Regions:
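Transmembrane helices and adjacent periplasmic/lumenal helix-loop junctions
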Residues: 272, 276-300, 321, 416-422
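Membrane-interface transmembrane helices that cradle and orient dolichyl/undecaprenyl
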Residues: 259-273
């Protein structure tokens, strides 16, 4: 019996997808779960729904469990490939299920183990200081307080930095992070909402893991061949950077997902929704601001003046709804924590220009002055303007994501801090450019077919008219 092509992937498309999934497994597996924080914690007590995981690892961090799950993901991929080789096709529903299983097996086990270990010891163990602080910020919001300008020196967070749960006066006085909360308001607001989830799943990393996995179905919002969309979506959700971010505790995934949704809504001409999604992305992470001019140009190319005004009002309204409560509470603390802290107060970290200058002796102190503002004005801003101009000239939406990838990478490089986890942003933007390219190619193909069909019908009608006149 013949199989309709819209119900199954052909052999080549299916094997391309499965090859991409296999590559993700192979890239992730050797380093999965490596280089955690060096906690000197007591063995975790098995508690609650995650007790089996804690028992399986003897109450400690065990990368072998994560790698076993990744190996299982590889086996699932291999079995699916064998089925394709035998049958010559892969049902579309089966392709979605296989991709989802592989992504889940790569992303979720590490997060669940970390949360189980944390619940069996103390909140300052088996977590990252940033997500621990986000959890605390969510509690403050639920209690009607602002997390900006708050003194975290006696919140429990101070016990994280010794890695054994102890605390010293020096830590409380010297650790700058205990006096600042660096995230835009969307993060504490989302943490406040997520904190209502029953324990132990109220850990913010569970939310991060879920939205990380959600990048896979988000890729299906774009148009194009299913196999290619699933491959790019799986890379968005389960790249080594995204997988590590989920269990280690860096909270970029919610903002990245919102940005992916924003671009998907642009290509679907849901312009008001795209503007709202961009605003949500910015509320969740400052880095999304860099995408604003690129997405604005993409919106302007598709919108009437009235629709563009409506999108602008929606964007401003969503931002205002997120920022205003904290501006009213303490505008100075909000600015000091989210803008000044990252640009001028935080110590120099990482492999960017600041780190290179520090190692070369040009900068003497990690806390010393660094001309970030001048570099941003002289280097990053002109480059971004050129990229936006190139996007405007090209008329193709995928160049917006490509331009954003280049712009944000340069911004990271010239900043005081260049964490490797930041690379998830240019990587996601590059994959997003691929999804946008597929969407535009599919759209142009449909337009060409429609034009050809219209011309054919018009030609046939014209010929019939001549024939009728000839008979007359």
């Amino acid at each position: 019996m013949a199989i309709r092509s819209d119900r199954a992937l052909g052999r080549a498309e299916a094997l391309l997808l499965l090859g991409a999934l296999g590559a993700l497994v192979a890239i992730n597996l050797p380093e999965l779960g490596s280089d955690p924080w060096p906690f000197r914690a007591p063995p975790a007590e098995p508690r609650g729904l995650l007790a089996p995981l804690v028992r399986a690892t003897g109450g400690g961090w065990e990368p072998g469990l994560l790698r076993a799950a990744a190996t299982l993901a590889g086996v699932v991929t291999a079995l699916a490939a064998a089925a394709v080789l035998v049958a010559g096709r892969l049902w579309r529903s089966a392709a979605v299920v296989v991709a989802a299983v592989v992504v889940a097996l790569l992303v979720l086990p590490g997060v669940l183990l970390q949360v189980g270990l944390r619940g069996g010891t103390a909140p300052w163990f088996h977590d990252n200081d940033s997500t621990y602080q986000i959890d605390i910020a969510g509690e403050l919001v639920r209690d009607g307080e602002t997390p900006y300008g708050y003194d975290y020196r006696f919140s429990g967070l101070e016990r994280f930095y010794s890695f054994d749960g102890s605390v010293s006066r020096q830590t409380r006085n010297a650790q700058v992070a205990l006096r600042h909360f660096a995230y835009f308001p969307g993060t504490p607001l989302s943490a406040a909402a997520w904190g209502a989830v029953p324990q132990p799943f109220d850990d913010y990393r569970i939310l991060v893991a879920l939205v990380t996995v959600a990048a896979l179905p988000a890729a299906l919002l774009f148009r194009g061949p299913l196999g290619a969309r699933l491959a790019l979506g799986a890379a968005l959700a389960a790249s080594p950077l995204a997988v590590r971010a989920a269990w280690f505790g860096t909270a970029d995934a919610p903002a990245v997902l919102a940005l992916v949704v924003a671009f998907a809504l642009v290509v679907r001409s849901r312009l008001t929704g795209a503007a709202a999604a961009l605003a949500v992305a910015i509320l969740l992470k400052q880095f999304a601001v860099v995408a604003a001019p690129f997405l604005a140009v993409a919106l302007a190319r598709r919108a009437s003046p009235r629709a563009l005004r409506r999108a602008g009002v929606t964007f401003a309204a969503v931002l205002a709804a997120g920022f205003l409560p904290f501006v009213i509470a303490d505008a100075g603390a909000l600015i000091a924590d989210t803008v000044v802290y990252g640009g001028a107060t935080y110590r120099i970290i990482g492999y960017g220009l600041a780190g290179v200058l520090l190692e070369a002796g040009v900068i003497e102190d990690r806390f010393g002055p660094y001309p970030f503002t001048a570099l941003a004005l002289l280097v990053w801003l002109p480059l971004t303007a050129l990229l936006v101009r190139a996007q405007t000239r090209s008329g193709e939406t995928w160049t917006a994501a490509a331009g954003f990838a280049a712009s944000v990478l340069v911004l990271f490089f010239i900043g005081r801090v260049f964490q490797t986890s930041y690379l998830v942003w240019p990587l996601a933007a590059a994959l997003l450019a691929g999804l946008l390219f597929l969407s535009e190619r599919r759209g142009s193909g449909r337009s060409a077919r429609a034009t050809t069909a219209s011309a054919t019908v018009s030609g046939a009608t014209h010929a019939d008219g001549h024939a009728a006149r000839g008979r007359a």
